[in-house]
Design a protein with these regions (language model features):
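Intrinsically disordered, low-complexity regions enriched in serine/threonine
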Residues: 3-191
């Protein structure tokens, strides 16, 4: 979706640049994942992604397109319209994460991962990586959300099936809608 980059990411990129995250802003590109199955499930799934990071970032739910009885191109065009609207909404939520300060980002990340029931081993590893890289000083919900993107990368390195990775990514995208202040508490939490 290179031709749509400016339309979809313009405001988000400007905020990233204003916060000194120019490298990230220059790498991001909107993308689409198209998944179909031959196991009797008569639908295809289309989902919005942010490409350009180490691992694509899933930023919303999947839009299903029923393809039994010979679906037509119009069915997919309708799904792409829904996906485009969802993408804009999700990028807006991602931008809002930049405005949410976290006093205890490691605790917040741990609580969010636990709340979303993310795989414990990979989540603990991602939390440790974040803590080594940034410590436990003040941060933003955006920084923590981006650090959480290590979890699918770790799972992929462990040869997790694509189906499980897709479910994990969809679940992680729910973090865009959380009230992060509820998770930013001083008391340490174990996973």
């Amino acid at each position: 979706m290179p031709g749509q980059k400016e339309k979809l990411l313009d405001t988000y990129e400007k905020v990233l640049i204003a916060q000194g995250k120019t490298t990230m802003a220059s790498k991001l590109m909107p993308g689409i994942r198209f998944v179909t199955s031959d196991t009797g499930v008569a639908s295809a799934k289309v989902s919005a992604m942010l490409m350009g990071t180490q691992y694509p970032i899933h930023i919303g739910g999947c839009v299903a397109v029923d393809h039994c009885n010979q679906a037509k191109v119009e069915n997919f065009e309708e799904a792409f319209s829904k996906l485009f609207a969802q993408f804009q909404d999700s990028v807006g939520k991602l931008k809002k994460l930049l405005e949410i300060p976290l006093a205890y980002p490691v605790n917040a990340m741990t609580r969010v991962c636990k709340s979303l029931s993310l795989p414990k081993k990979a989540a603990v590893e991602a939390i440790a990586m974040y803590e080594m890289a940034y410590g436990d000083g003040p941060s933003t919900a955006h920084d923590v959300f981006m650090a959480m993107q290590e979890i699918p990368y770790i799972m992929k390195a462990e040869h997790t099936s694509e189906d499980k990775l897709l479910r994990l990514e969809e679940n992680m995208a729910r973090a865009l809608t959380l009230r992060w202040s509820d998770y930013d508490l001083p008391k340490a939490v174990s996973f």
